Amino acid sequence: MVYKSIDDYKMVVHNSSIVINHCKLTDFPTLIRQFGVWDKVCHRVNYVGIYYDPEKQRLFLPRGIDVEYVRRKVESTMDPDEFSSYIARYNHYDKVTKRIRMKMLPRDDVQKEALNFGLCKGKYYCNSGKTQFAINLTTGKGKTYIASCIMSYLGIRSIVITSQSGILDQWREKIKEYTDIDDSEIVKIEGGPMIGRILNDSSMMANKSLYLCTHSTLQTYGSTHGWDKVGLLFEKLGIGIKFFDEAHQNFQNMALIDFATRDVWRTYYITATPSRSDRQEDIIYKLYMKNVPSINLFNPEVDAHTSYIAIKYNSYPTPSDVNACKNNVYGLSNPLYIDYLMRNNRFWIMFDYIFSLIYRSGGKALFYIGTNSAIEKVYERIMFNYPELWNDVGIYTSISEDKQQAKTKKYILTTTKSAGAGEDIPDLKYSVVLAEPFKSEVITRQTLGRTRNPNTSYIELVDVGFRQLQGFFNAKRHIFNKYASKSKVMFVDNPKLANIDEETRIHMRDRFKYPLEFNVPNNIEAISFIKEKNIPAVYFASETQERKE
C-alpha cells in the first residue's frame, strides 16, 4: 500500500501524542477505560488525558504511555496485514532572534543536577532522543531559573504556559532577572483577537524569542475555533519548546495542548507536586507521565525547613450542626462548615489566641480561609481587636481591588485557590490553615511550600468535633512527616481553652493601657486617627473588665 500522507497510517507516534486514525471510540474499550473518571455529580464517566475527534475519527493518546501496548490493542481490532504505523519526527522550529545569555550560575548542586537532566548532559545523555521531560523541584528551588537556562542554552523559540495571568508576569520578571533578554523579545499572548492576528500574518508579534500564555487563552480559542488552530499558532510562531508551569494543574487542558502541538520538539513539565488531588485523576496523570523521563531532587535533610504544628480542638457541634454541614457527594461541605465556624465562639477563641501569638512574635503570616464571606468576617475581627493594623492586613482573593498589593501586607487572608501553585509570596514566616479543610496531598504540599525560608512554621487548626476533619488530618500526617522539618500535635481541651481565652484577654487589656502605635505618619494621634477611620471600637484599660464579643 502506498501512503500519501501521514493521516493514512493507522497509528502515528508524535513528539507529545499518539494518534490512532480511522477509528471509533468504542473500538478499544479496555484501553479507553483506563482514562475514565466517574463524575459523582452527573453520574457518568468522563474521559481525562485523551481526546477523540468524531469528525476526523481520530483518537489522541498521551505519548507517555507504552507504545507497544497501544500497538497491540490497535492490532487486535483489525487484520495484522492492514496495520500500519509511523514515527513522526518533524522538529520544525525557529531559533531565538537574539542570543540569550544567563546572568548568574546555578546556586547549588540541585540546580546543576536539574540542568544536566533537562539538557541531557552527563549521565542523562541517554535521554537525548526523548521529547518530553518532567522536572519536579520543591518550591523555591528555582524552576524558573532552570527553564531560563534551558531556553538560553538551546537557543530555541519557547513558550511558557501557566494557569494564571499573574503568574506569567512573575515568569517575565524572573526571566529578565536571570538573563539578558530584552523585554521586547517577550510577548504575552492575551485573548483570541491577538491569536487571530498572528494566524493572519497581521501581527508584529510573530517573530520573538519567548511567548507567555495562559491555559484559559488557549482553551477558549481551541474550543471556539478548533484545536488544530492552536497547533497552527505554534507553527506560525516557530515554537520548538513548551514549558508547562505547575503541570499537574489544568491536566485535561494540558493534554489537549499536547495533542494539538504534537510536533513541538520538546515539552517540559515543571511542578513541585507531580500528582492530582482526585484519586482517579492522579492514577491517569501518572499513566500520562509513565514513560516520560523525570527527576525529583527533594532532600529531606536539606529541603525540609518548615515545622508543622497541628492544634486540635473541639467546636462541639450538635448533631443538627453536623447534619447541616453534610454534602451528599463529598461527605462534608466546606462552605457550610466554614459558615458554621463563623458562628462558633470556640473557633473565635482559637483564632484570637493564634493571631495574638503571631502578632507578638512578629513576622509575615498567611491565613487560609475557605470563603470570601468568612475572610471578611476574619478581617473585621482583626480590625476590631487590632485597629492599628488597618494598613497591614491584605485580602488576596477575587474580592480584593489590588491582589498584588495585598501580597505585600504583613498579614494576608486568602484561600488555597487564590494562593495556589506557582504563587510567589516572599518572606512568609507563618502559614496558617485556619478555616479551610482539605485532605489533598497536592494542596497540602503546595500550602507547605508557601514558606520558603528556614525556621518557618505551618500551623493547622483541626476541629475534632467532625470525624471527617479528623480523617483529613490522618490522611496528611505522612506528608508532614516527610516534608516538614519537624511535626508537633497539641490538643486544646476545655481547661486549656479557658486558659488561652484568659491569656488573650490579658494580652488585649495590656495592649490598650497605652496609646496604640499605628502604621501612619508620626504626627497623627492614635485616637483622632481611630475616629477619623470610623473604626468600630477600641478597648481601654477601664473597659476591659467585661469583654464584649
Language model regions located:
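Walker A/P-loop
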Residues: 126-150
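Conserved Walker A/P-loop ATP-binding site and its immediately adjacent core
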Residues: 146, 153-178, 371-375
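Conserved helix-turn-beta segment of the N-terminal RecA-like "Helicase ATP-binding" lobe
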Residues: 167-193, 386-388
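Conserved two-lobed SF2 helicase motor
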Residues: 205-224, 407-420
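Post-DEXD/H (motif II) to motif III coupling segment of the RecA-like Helicase ATP-binding lobe
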Residues: 246-304
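A conserved SF2-helicase RecA2
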Residues: 289-299, 453-516
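Conserved interdomain linker/interface between the two RecA-like ATPase lobes of SF2 helicase motors
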Residues: 294-363
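Conserved RecA-like P-loop NTPase helicase motor core
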Residues: 398-479
